[in-house]
A protein has these predicted regions:
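N-terminal Rossmann-like NAD(P)+-binding subdomain of aldehyde/semialdehyde dehydrogenases
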Residues: 2-116, 144, 284
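ALDH superfamily catalytic-core signature
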Residues: 9, 14, 21-23, 139-140, ...
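Conserved active-site and cofactor/substrate-binding residues in soluble primary-metabolism enzymes
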Residues: 22-25, 29-32, 44-47, 51-55, ...
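Short, flexible turn/loop "capping" segments at secondary-structure junctions
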Residues: 30-32, 227-229, 257-262, 346-353, ...
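Rossmann-like NAD(P) dinucleotide-binding subdomain of oxidoreductase/dehydrogenase enzymes
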Residues: 106-245
Length: 395
């Protein structure tokens, strides 16, 4: 157990920070130390908080490239260059978005009615981090915790714990150097379901990013929770749409980090008048349309017993085709299966965190909406859907 002492303006803080959190007792001790640190952090001024927020965001942004490389190397998923962008967004863009936001003391006052709104931290945040976006999610959650004077305990995914903890350490060290209390950011060294559940029970707020089971557990914990679960994004291409723009946008979205962004398109629903044109544009831009027998092979590869096959997550199209026993050009961008059913019994109708798309031909616009609604419902309402349409021409 390390004993840390730091001078922060008029504050003298002594925090006993356990070196690790590998079992329930150690986690409990680490949370006690964090509560002590957070009680001091809650007294900081806006000026002190903003200095810490800036230093932490700057440090995370400067480490965006090595952290991206570490995440890909550890998980075997995704694209280094795209993870660099995600880390950049989670640090510099988040800083620029919230740098002028007041989070301490009186943040709003209505003198006419005698009302003041005062910002107060909630306490300790439990942050559940996914394997798909480990470093960027850890950076983002740690930064918003610092900006709001909360402590944050991170539970990494077991397959991404090294890179997740590395990102958290960078943010913590920069924050402490800028004046934050020791132990204000922590993590579970060897995450287990037991420790994650214990963390959710002990925390004051849960930020859960992950699969449906995890998000449901967070919502059922009895604590306030904000969940980011799976999506099943449909994209409708209307017959008035700019076809090249629509196809290029979908390809860019679906190939970014090998399709691991949960808001990326999972299905394309096309109106009959432009179906052949859309198909031709996808093929022209390097996508591969699977033949009927190849569709069946890919079906069996992307889903196993109704669940997404972990072996395809974050892999490129060529690798997935190889796993399925399908021969495609090595530079293939996306594997596209033309299917009819939107039922969950159709493997292509599920969320696929990889460059594999379902493509549907709608009878008309109403049919396209019906198909899209069914896909969104199966993936979870309140997530993402997109529509490519020229509304002026439609009118």
């Amino acid at each position: 157990m390390a004993i840390k002492e730091k001078n922060i303006g008029v504050h003298v803080i002594e925090v006993h920070v356990p070196e690790t959190a590998e079992n329930v007792n150690e986690l409990s001790e680490k949370l006690k130390a964090m509560r002590k640190a957070q009680s001091v952090f809650a007294t900081y001024t806006q000026e002190q908080v903003d200095k810490i927020f800036y230093a932490a965001a700057k440090a995370a942004n400067q480490a965006r490239i090595p952290l991206a490389k570490m995440a890909v190397e550890e998980t075997g998923m995704g694209v280094v260059e795209d993870k660099v962008i995600k880390n950049h967004y989670a640090s510099e863009y988040i800083y620029n978005q919230y740098k002028n936001t007041r989070t301490c003391g009186v943040i709003e006052e209505d003198r006419a009615f005698g009302i003041k709104r005062i910002a107060e931290p909630v306490g300790i945040i439990a942050a559940i981090i996914p394997t798909t976006n480990p470093t960027s999610t850890a950076i983002f959650k740690a930064l918003i915790a610092l900006k709001t004077r909360n402590g944050i305990m991170i539970s990494p995914h077991p397959r991404a714990k090294k890179s997740t903890i590395a990102a958290a350490k960078i943010v913590l060290e920069a924050a402490v150097k800028a004046g934050a209390p020791e132990g204000i950011i922590g993590w579970i060294d060897n995450p287990t379901l037991e420790l994650t559940n214990e963390l959710m029970r002990e925390a004051d707020l849960i930020l859960a990013t992950g699969g449906p089971g995890l998000v449901k557990a967070a919502y059922s914990s009895g604590k306030p929770a904000i969940g980011v679960g799976p999506g099943n994004t449909p994209a409708i291409i209307d017959d008035t749409a700019d076809i090249r723009l629509a196809v290029n946008s979908i390809i860019h979205s679906k190939t970014f980090d090998n399709g691991m962004i949960c808001a990326s398109e999972q299905s394309v629903i096309v109106l009959p008048r432009v179906y052949d044109e859309v198909k031709k544009e996808f093929a022209y831009r390097g996508c591969y349309f699977l033949k009927p027998d190849e569709i069946e092979k890919v079906r069996k590869t992307i889903m196993i017993d109704g669940s997404l096959n972990a072996k395809v997550v974050g892999q490129n199209a060529y690798t997935i085709a190889k796993l399925a026993g399908v021969e495609v050009p090595e530079n293939t961008k996306i594997l596209i299966g033309e299917v009819e059913s939107t039922d969950i019994s159709e493997e292509f109708a599920h969320e696929k965190l990889c460059p594999v798309l379902a493509m549907y031909k709608a009878k008309d616009f109403d049919d396209a909406l019906t198909k899209a609604e069914k896909l969104v419902a199966d993936g979870g309402f309140g997530h993402t859907a997109s529509l490519y349409i020229d509304t002026l021409e439609k009118e």
